[in-house]
From Swiss-Prot:
Cellular component terms (Gene Ontology): membrane
InterPro entries reported for this sequence: Pecanex, Pecanex_C
Stretches with biased composition (Polar residues): 427-437, 488-497, 1978-1987
Protein localization: Membrane
Topology of this chain in the membrane: Multi-pass membrane protein
Name by which UniProt lists this protein: Pecanex-like protein 3
Length: 2028
């Protein structure tokens, strides 16, 4: 805690004060000195110039020139150095620091090529969203995070008893395995390993020799004789291109050498092994040994300091690592004085590079061969520094102790270091090391979780079974530890203090572990090139080895990146496209932009799902804070540790199944394998290499996920590849501790850094001339911020010069004196320094990590303030304007300007504190805020959603005002005649109202408008974009938006003309002048009364708790009393009244008020010119009129109060201050909006800190509560300022102390974050099969919020207009809460008939705090009977005193308790309970077989399959007598047709059970097929059913009778993962449609039938019933895996029903669920939240997590506070501040898409609709006259008002809202499809869901061109009941029309595209088209549950004329899902 506070003070507070400079102990001395000197120069230089030289512009010019030169030089060098690193031209250079003796020792190798090294690329985030850390879902460890789980067991003596260990560890679990027991036993013995046979040098290994078994044998060299030091391949690394580390490697890879080496790693723990691994106290040091501890700088993803911006050197201080010296060796002390530039490392995930430890932890593998008969000793040394084993000048070693005859051996990795570029391209297919296609084992390293290869001990040439040997002087099977040398020298070594276990290599087959003394510290290793260990191992790395990193690390990191575990992507986008056969390692925590949970690990080592289940149980335990080892570690320990047990022995015979018996066998590929019985074997078979085998044959495919084990395809390589063979490791002293959630991925994926090669880069300073520069990118990034472009550099130099010029200009002007001169120079220096090294993260930065925009904030603001000071001073001096008095304030006087100048001057001097407190936003946010405020408060605009939209909106308003200004000026410049209004003024009024109406209807986002323009002007671009978009399933949303905007534009074209003409007529009359004394007050009173009734009284009566006194709404919707909503909400009378009053208010009352004020003011100005000139008065009138009218059109709920306050204040209270009603109204509207903000802020603050309901989330909250009392006065001042500037008031760290944040626009979140889906369309196939990406509840459930967003898009605007959410305004926030969906809805832009909103979905089952708050908003308070401390009860329907008091002290209120919205009801059943017993599984398998037979018989390719020769030949043996498929996956318990006699599946037994079903299915075919028992059809069905069941058994490992493997296999088949492993099934590859169209849908359909079996077990006994059920399900239901894009497409297309099998792998669960979705209408509670509460809490979260770097996942600011919904609101922030599972894009809802509102208002008007209405009216009149003349005959029903118009075109019956009677029967049936959100092709031929059309019906006669609608024979589809269907079925102009009874384009306003809907023609009797009882039963709900209201007044609600198409039954097979056939034919 203390170190974190110091870090915040140093990197946050101090850096903010200085502009970015602070002392960073983690950086090099050069870097700190450079920063200090630059900052001092920028501070002192202007100060000295001002103090020493006389003030003149010449000095200012010199100052600017010097600053420009310095900045240009620094920026140029920085830019060119980055370009140098990008080019990657490396100059090889000899190690200059190598000592003479070391050079002699390396003489033999000096000619080898040096490691050129590869420069690091700068990594940046793959996405803009850092990972989630705060969610309840993210306390997950991955398999490779074992390092963070392993404890340290530091024993105080050489011998410790197990009981002592357990007692010492307390409650922590210690896993003590047989290997540990061996270590404890052996630790008491100290015996030196005797002299071992020497190995002659020069023996070269034979590359053809095999690698040995990973658990049984060791790598061999040559004929079993270990080699000395001889040549090795010297393939250098190719240079980097464009700075990417993942570029192509050279033609040939570096050859690894020396397979017989032990692993040597330096240890970072202060511990040492004594003897054979006995535990030794590590703290016994000499008195002179220092013991520095870790520096405590724990960086997480929330710390975005300079260390995170690639400028950190060492995150830990030096530790003393004590290791044993080799026997006989003297270890001289050496200093750890490594050049800091070699240790410069980043620690920032967000800066784009891995963290400090990530790059610092490469393993170095050294060692030498061991004689055949000896078990080689283990050298375990672990460095934790990048400068690992670097050469340095140290005392020469004593070589006399080396055994004679030995020469120094070469290192394991020589020459050009093997893949030193540890960072590989994120998306590359091949990481460098993995390109060798090697199989690897990964040790769980402590802080790095990296792989370490453990080469095997050497073995004799004989390839027989391994014998356990003891070293010299030891008995067989006993390990003899060496003695510890007496005079071990201990030297300090830099190390990490995070290691919790040592990873030791051990002999897999033998039960003994031989350990040599550990190598000494780094100094000893580096200083003794000639020293040899007891086993003949050199303890020194020659120079080449120092440069050679471990070969495994780069590939490990590359794979993790490739799997998405490492959050970085290289700067350059070039990536290799290679194929690799390497099985990818487990990714730790997959990062989804969705913010969903990390993907759990797949089953490792080819394990069956049981281990996967175990893995997830381990995760669940870790989540519940139980100290349990994660399953992956359990698995590794059981597999690896137990093999060291003494019971492992070779099997005595074939039947030996005793514990530890090892059997050998050959698999089908000829690979020799071993299998060990019992725990020692771990249940897995291991490959055993033999003499002469290829190395590839010995590799074990550890990561195979198929049911059969197979070898990896490792290509033939040299013996060096043996290093990469798997090798078990021992995890010593394992103990689990809890992993803090804030550990970033980059810190859990640490890799030990290799020793960096000393190389230089070519720096081209002139064309053709270069010099060598020895530097690296990380050091440069630590030194200076990177600027990527030339223009950015030029802009930075220019900005720094401008800062210097303007600052010095103010100094020359004399604005500052005394100490303020120095303060101003400090401000100048901070602004300039931020252009070189900015504050990261800044207090105003909305994101973690490096924010490049922030770097420009200070200088830009400084320039603006300086210009403002200079301008105000000039204006005050010149006084160009005469002073004006407005509302008692004198404006434009000299004192006014000077006062403003002084305020700006003081503000500029306070810049360091302003930026420390974060009171100024970053530049782009400030620009957007200013433009939005000007547009909203000056011109009545709507909110902006981005800086671009703000610019567009303000430009549009300025153009409109400029156009109107000319008319207004011309009208008031000429004198007016008495009692007359000039025509020009009337024209101005007409244009003003019309343009205000049009602007209020347009969105501020021009994207859709531009797409319309582009489609008209540039159709080729549109076609190109469409072709690109066809790759994914089509999204109907963009086209629907374009259609809606097109309708609005066409409607406005008509309505604006009408409005302008009417307004002109009214204004031209003299009504406003003649009645100006009376009319104004009448209009004010009318507006006030209507507004009060509409916006106060009605909403209060409709609230859940009216006035917080009544317990029920007075005006209840029809659904209020329903327990379960059955249909769409009914339109109530008070909703119609509310909408009608709003219409009258918007379009009649307020335009009249504004026109009256305009006319009166203009008349007054013309008659009596006032203090304003005419030009100013015309401008004021234009702007005020535009603003007031647009505000009235957009947001009428707030207008009546503004008008009332204006009248009261300026007509009665202060009439002398009035400047005319129009200007008064304009000013009061601005003032009222600020007062509303202030009111909301005060309510939030008082509610939050009310002492009787304070909820302290932490101890800090309790501590800060008393300090809030003296803070109250300051708090009120802050509230006033924040209300004035629209800034949030945020609680500091969630406490009761509030501080003001920076100004934000209405869209107050600055990052455009929205959730990206994770499904099979955007993930790799291998991850789909192995890891099932996104298989967690959050990712899978996010689709329901996406569907909810689409539903709201159709209905939200209309529902708001109908008053169903109460009063609303821009910026309001609502919470929608139902049983499982909890979403936060932000209203951003509120226009006239449009709403732009964003929805944020929370977790279904969230944290404890979230559940408490959900309970608070969903539970009722009606039952509360308390009054103070007693319970007297309450009056009927009235709240008790306590409940009423409590509801008033909440920051939220329930506005509707029954808001009906279309969505999906989700039912999930646990699949385990439904398949627990064998009988239930047998039912499923039987339905599986029947479904396969059904799909075979229905397939159109059946004839092709039956005639296929290959298929017939493969199935011919099936018909032989006595044939049975005896696969072990078949059993009597699950296969109904199992043949006991033949012990398998035979054709006769199959026919005995399924022949009747086959014959029935064949009989339903149109073409007859042979159906005999031995016919090709039956044989094909038999073959496919056997294949399908074998695939299920193979996937589920059905040898086991347990349920989990069965579910695993069922889920694998359900998602399409078919593994055809048997040669007998390969005939299916003759046509893949056999799998795609038969077997795959069969397993899905079987699951649905199995579900139905529980409701009616005997329903499907008859073949006809089963056949019809499958056919109905096939057409009505979409059955798909949730990862399939078809699933998302089906949901977004509003499919009625869906089914899926979900495998949930969350941290707390691992189970299979059957998910059933049914589309229906859901009931939500609508809770309106105080918008300032949301703004304040979000601002507080941002400040706490980004700037204050609070990493605590259980921080107090997210604990539940029911009065403010603190947890729910904070959870909905953008990730990583919050953790919503879905964030929608900004979505616009239009009123025209609401069907009920359109029915109420008639819809938009267009020219085409008007023309059609006129023609129809004429035709109707003509027919009526003709019928009247023909002896009084009746007119056709179709022409009597019920048949034409909109209703005839509607694709729905006119029945608007079903009554309970006619809707009662529909509860059992799935609802008909709702809004037509996408193309919904039908599966049938007609496609419209009706019987074949009656062709004799005459189509309606339509004059004019034919309608652009479906053909006359194509009738309405019941699957499209919503409004948008009307948009698609229209006339040539494609527009709506008004309702028929309203005159314009009534129901007859549209051409009929099918038969008239009003009734059948007279010539036709009503037809009963019911096909069958089933059909009619299906049709009934389709008819009675339509959403559309009755559109024609002549038809009573709830009824339809007989024979209307609405009465037509819907055949069952036609009621199809919207996704249609493409959704049912999935691709696998």
């Amino acid at each position: 805690m203390g170190s974190q506070v110091l870090q915040i003070l140093r990197q946050g507070v101090w850096a903010s004060l200085t502009g970015g400079w602070f002392f960073d102990p983690h950086q090099s001395t050069f870097s700190n000195c450079f920063h200090l000197y630059v900052w001092i120069f920028l501070l002192i230089f202007p100060f000295l110039l001002y103090m020493v030289l006389p003030p003149s512009l010449m000095v200012a010019g010199v100052y600017c020139l010097v600053v420009a030169v310095i900045f240009a030089t620094i920026k140029t060098v920085n830019y060119r150095l980055h370009a140098m690193f990008d080019q990657g031209e490396i100059v090889e250079k000899r190690n200059s620091t190598m000592g003479e003796q070391e050079e002699e020792a390396a003489q033999g190798e000096s000619s080898l090529p040096r490691d050129p090294g590869v420069e690091m690329t700068v990594f940046r985030k793959v996405s803009s969203t850092p990972p989630v850390r705060c969610s309840s879902q993210h306390s997950v460890f991955g398999f490779n995070q074992v390092s963070e789980l392993l404890p340290r067991m530091e024993d105080s003596g050489p011998l410790r008893d197990i009981k002592e260990l357990v007692r010492e560890q307390g409650s922590n679990n210690v896993i003590v395995t047989s290997a540990d027991r061996e270590m404890l036993k052996l630790s008491s013995q100290e015996k030196l390993i005797g002299d071992l046979p020497q190995t002659p040098p020069g023996v070269v290994p034979d590359p053809s020799l095999p690698s040995t078994d990973s658990s049984e044998r060791s790598p061999m060299a040559g004929d079993g004789v270990p080699w000395g030091g001889s040549g090795v391949a010297d393939t250098p690394m190719s240079p980097l291109l464009k700075g990417s580390l993942s570029q192509e490697l050279s033609k040939s890879f570096l050859t690894l050498t020396r397979p017989d080496r032990a692993l040597v790693r330096t240890s970072s723990r202060r511990e040492q092994c004594r003897g054979t691994g006995g535990y030794q106290p590590l703290d016994r040091r000499g008195s002179g040994d220092p013991m520095p501890q870790k520096a405590g700088s724990s960086d997480s993803c929330f710390s975005g300091t300079d260390r995170e911006t690639l400028s950190s050197f060492k995150s830990e201080k030096t530790n003393s690592t004590h290791l044993d010296s080799p026997p006989g060796g003297h270890a001289p002390e050496g200093s750890d004085t490594d050049p800091p530039s070699e240790a410069e490392l980043p620690a920032s995930p967000d800066a784009g590079v891995p963290s400090d430890d990530t790059l610092r932890s490469f393993d170095t593998v050294i060692g030498a061969g061991t004689p055949p008969g000896q078990t080689e000793p283990l050298l375990v040394v672990r460095p934790k520094d990048l400068a690992l084993l670097r050469p340095s000048k140290r005392r020469p070693p004593m070589r006399g102790h080396s055994p004679p005859g030995r020469t120094p051996r070469r290192p394991l990795l020589e020459g050009s270091g093997f893949f030193e570029d540890e960072d590989t391209s994120e998306g590359s297919e091949l990481s460098p090391a993995s390109s060798l296609r090697s199989q690897r084992r990964y040790s769980t390293d402590s802080s790095s979780s990296t792989s370490c290869y453990s080469p095997e001990s050497s073995q004799g040439a004989a390839g027989g079974p391994r014998k356990r040997r003891a070293p010299h002087g030891a008995e067989e099977g006993t390990a003899v530890p060496p003695k510890r040398p007496y005079g071990t020298q201990r030297t300090p070594s830099t190390a990490s203090a995070k290691t919790h276990a040592r990873v030791l290599s051990m002999d897999g087959a033998g039960g003994d572990v031989l350990r040599a003394p550990l190598a000494g510290s780094k100094a000893e290793l580096e200083a003794q090139p000639g020293m040899e260990l007891a086993a003949g191992e050199p303890a020194v790395l020659p120079p080449e080895a120092r440069r050679g990193p471990a070969a495994n690390q780069p590939g490990w990191r590359g794979e993790l990146q490739e799997e998405g575990a490492v959050g970085g992507a290289p700067e350059e986008t070039g990536q290799r496209e290679c194929t690799s056969n390497v099985r990818r390692a487990q990714a730790i925590r997959r990062r989804h932009n969705a913010g969903s949970n990390p993907t759990p690990p797949a089953s490792v080592m080819g394990s069956p799902p049981s281990s996967l289940q175990e893995a997830q149980r381990g995760r669940a335990a870790s989540h519940s804070r139980a100290l349990t080892l994660p399953s992956a570690l359990h698995f590794a320990s059981s597999l690896l540790l137990t093999r060291a047990g003494p019971n492992v022995h070779e099997a005595s015979n074939f039947d030996d199944t005793s514990e530890g018996a090892v059997h050998y066998f050959y698999d089908e590929s000829g690979v020799r394998r071993s299998y060990t019985f019992g725990l020692a074997g771990g249940g897995y078979e291991n490959p055993v290499s033999q003499p002469g085998e290829q190395a590839a044959n010995g590799a074990w495919d550890r990561h195979s996920h198929s049911s059969s084990f197979h070898s990896a395809d490792v290509p033939e390589a040299t013996g060096g590849l043996n290093l990469l063979q798997p090798r078990p490791v021992v995890l010593q002293g394992m103990q689990v501790r809890r992993v803090p959630l804030e550990i970033p991925e980059e810190q859990t994926l640490m890799e030990e850094a290799p020793p960096r090669a000393q190389h230089s880069y070519k720096y081209w300073f002139l064309p053709g001339r270069w010099t060598s520069v020895r530097y690296e990118r990380l050091a440069l990034l630590a030194l200076l911020d990177r600027t990527r472009g030339v223009m950015e550099n030029i802009f930075g130099v220019g900005l720094s010069s401008l800062v210097a010029f303007l600052g010095y200009l103010l100094l020359l002007k004399g604005f500052f004196t005394d100490i303020w001169v120095f303060q101003f120079c400090l401000v100048i220096a901070s602004c300039q320094y931020s252009l070189l090294k900015s504050v990261q993260p800044d207090a105003a930065s909305p994101m973690h990590g490096h924010n490049w925009v922030i770097a420009y904030s200070r200088p830009v603001y400084f320039c603006i303030c300086c210009l403002l000071i200079w301008l105000l001073d000039a204006l005050g001096t010149a006084q160009p304007f005469p002073p004006v008095s407005l509302y008692g304030l004198t404006l434009f006087s000299a004192s006014f300007f000077f006062c403003a100048r002084d305020v700006a001057t003081v503000f500029t001097l306070c810049f360091p504190f302003v930026f420390l407190l974060g009171l100024l936003p970053q530049v782009n946010t400030c620009l957007m805020y200013l433009l939005e405020q000007i547009d909203m408060h000056g011109f009545g605009g709507t909110a902006a959603t981005s800086p671009l939209t703000a610019v567009f909106s303000l430009t549009r308003s300025l153009l409109a005002a400029a156009l109107l200004y000319g008319f207004c000026l011309g009208a008031i410049k000429t004198p007016w005649p008495e009692q007359h209004v000039p025509v020009l003024f009337s024209v101005f009024c007409g244009l003003l109202v019309a343009m205000s109406y049009h602007l209020s209807r347009q969105s501020s986002d021009p994207t859709v408008l531009w797409s319309l323009v582009r489609s008209k002007l540039f159709p080729e671009l549109e076609e190109r974009s469409l072709e690109t978009a066809r790759v994914e399933p089509p999204d109907p949303l963009p086209e629907k938006m374009r259609q809606s905007v097109r309708e609005v534009l066409h409607s406005d074209l008509v309505m604006c003309v009408v409005i302008a003409v009417l307004t002109f007529a009214v204004s031209a009359s003299t009504v406003f002048i003649a009645l100006k004394s009376v009319l104004g007050f009448v209009l004010y009173a009318l507006a006030g009364a209507v507004g009060f009734f509409t916006h106060y009284l009605l909403p209060q009566l409709r609230k859940q708790l009216p006035w917080f006194c009544l317990s029920q709404p007075v005006l209840k919707p029809l659904e209020y009393s329903q327990y379960e909503v059955r249909g769409a909400a009914q339109v109530m009378w008070f909703e119609k009244l509310y909408a009608g009053l709003q219409c009258a208010e918007k379009y009649l009352i307020y335009p009249a008020v504004v026109l009256n004020a305009l006319t009166v003011d203009a008349h007054t100005v013309v008659s009596h010119p006032d203090k304003f000139c005419l030009y100013c008065r015309a401008l004021l009138m234009t702007v005020a009129g535009l603003k007031l009218l647009r505000s009235a059109f957009c947001c009428p709920p707030q207008q009546y109060l503004t008008l009332a306050f204006t009248v009261l204040l300026f007509h009665f209270d202060y009439p002398r201050l009035s400047q005319g009603f129009l200007l008064d109204y304009f000013l009061m509207s601005l003032l009222c909006s600020k007062l509303w903000d202030l009111l909301y802020k005060l309510r939030f603050v008082l509610t939050y800190i009310a002492p009787w309901q304070i909820t302290w989330g932490s101890a800090f909250h309790a501590f800060a509560q008393p300090f809030a009392v003296p803070h109250s006065a300051m708090l009120f001042l802050q509230a006033l300022l924040s209300g004035l500037f629209s800034t949030p008031l945020n609680p500091l760290l969630g406490s009761a102390v509030f501080i003001m944040s920076y100004a934000r626009p209405l869209k107050f979140w600055e990052r455009d974050y929205n959730t990206k889906r994770v499904d099979h369309s955007n993930t790799r196939l291998v991850t789909q099969l192995d890891r099932n990406p996104g298989a967690d509840d959050n990712n899978l459930n996010s689709i329901f919020y996406e569907h909810l967003t689409r539903s709201l898009q159709h209905t939200l605007c209309g529902d708001l207009v109908l008053g169903r959410w109460g009063n609303y305004g821009p910026g309001d926030c609502f919470v929608l809460a139902s049983d499982y969906l909890n979403a936060l809805v932000h209203l951003i832009e509120v226009g006239n008939g449009l709403i732009t909103f964003q929805l944020r979905g929370l977790e279904f089952r969230g944290t404890y705090c979230q559940q408490r708050e959900v309970e608070a908003i969903t539970e009722g308070v009606e039952e509360d009977e308390g009054c103070c401390c007693c319970e007297p009860g309450h009056l009927p329907r009235v709240l008790s005193f306590n409940a009423a008091f409590g509801q008033r002290w909440l920051a939220w209120e329930v506005t509707a308790s029954k808001y009906v919205l279309e969505g999906y009801s989700i039912s999930d059943n646990n699949a385990a309970s439904m398949l627990q017993v064998f009988d239930l599984r047998k039912i499923l398998v039987t339905y599986y077989v029947k479904s396969i037979i059904y799909y075979v018989s229905r397939s159109p390719k059946l004839e092709t399959w039956l005639n296929h020769e290959g298929i017939a030949a493969a199935l011919r043996p099936v018909r032989a007598l006595g044939y049975a498929d005896s696969d072990p996956t078949f059993s009597l318990s699950v296969d109904e047709d199992y043949d006991l006699r033949l012990s398998g599946l035979s054709l006769p037994s199959f026919c005995a059970v399924h022949l009747e079903w086959i014959q029935y299915c064949a009989s339903r075919r149109s073409q007859p097929v042979d159906q005999d028992w031995n016919s090709p059809l039956v044989t094909l069905c038999f073959g496919l059913c056997v294949l399908g069941r074998r695939a299920l058994g193979t996937a589920s490992h059905s040898m086991s009778a347990s349920l989990e493997p069965f579910l695993y296999g069922l889920h694998a088949l359900f998602k399409g993962d078919f593994r055809i492993t048997s040669p007998r099934d390969e005939w299916v590859f003759a046509d893949m449609d056999l799998l795609h169209r038969v077997v795959a849908p069969g397993v899905r359909m079987a699951l649905k039938l199995h579900q139905d079996h529980f409701t009616s077990p005997d329903e499907y006994e008859e073949p006809a019933a089963l056949y019809d059920a499958i056919a109905a399900n096939e057409e009505r239901l979409v059955i798909s895996h949730e990862g399939d894009p078809a699933w998302r497409s089906a949901i977004l297309s509003n499919t009625p029903s869906l089914l899926a099998l979900r495998h949930v792998m969350d941290d707390a669960s691992d189970e299979y669920k059957i998910i059933m979705l049914n589309r229906r209408h859901l009931s939500f509670r609508v809770i309106k939240v105080n918008r300032e509460c949301v703004r304040g809490l979000w601002a507080g979260q941002q400040q706490e997590l980004v700037f204050l770097r609070n990493r605590n996942p259980e921080r107090g600011s997210i604990q539940n506070a029911k009065q403010a919904l603190r947890n729910m609101i904070n959870s909905s922030c953008d990730q990583p501040l919050g953790y919503p599972i879905y964030v929608s894009p900004l979505t616009t809802s239009l009123a025209g898409s609401h069907p009920q509102l359109r029915a109420l208002w008639g819809g938009p008007v267009s020219l085409g609709a008007i023309a059609r209405w006129l023609l129809r009216s004429w035709e109707r009149l003509h027919k009526g006259c003709g019928a009247g003349c023909n002896s009084g005959g009746n007119v056709d029903d179709s022409d009597c008002g019920g048949g034409g118009g909109l209703t005839s075109l509607s694709n729905h019956p006119p029945l608007a809202h079903p009554t309970p009677e006619n809707a009662a029967g529909s509860s059992e049936q799935p609802l008909p499809p709702g809004p037509s959100w996408g193309p919904r092709p039908s599966l049938s031929g007609s496609g419209d869901g009706r019987p074949p059309p009656l062709l004799q019906w005459p189509p309606p006669r339509l004059p004019g061109p034919p309608p652009a609608s479906p053909a006359p024979t194509e009738g309405p589809r019941p699957s499209r009941p919503s409004g948008p269907a009307l948009l698609n079925s229209e006339g040539p102009s494609g527009k709506w029309s008004l309702g028929g009874r309203k005159g314009l384009g009534g129901p007859d306003g549209e051409p009929a595209s099918g038969s008239p809907k009003g009734g059948t023609p007279k010539s036709q009797a009503p037809l009963d088209l019911s096909l069958s009882p089933d059909v009619s039963s299906e049709a009934s709900p389709a008819r009675t549950t339509q959403d559309l209201p009755c559109l024609d007044s002549s038809i009573p609600e709830g009824c339809t004329p007989s024979g209307a198409p609405g009465d037509w039954p819907v055949p069952a097979e036609e009621r199809e899902s919207p996704a249609a056939q493409p959704l049912l034919e999935h691709q696998y």
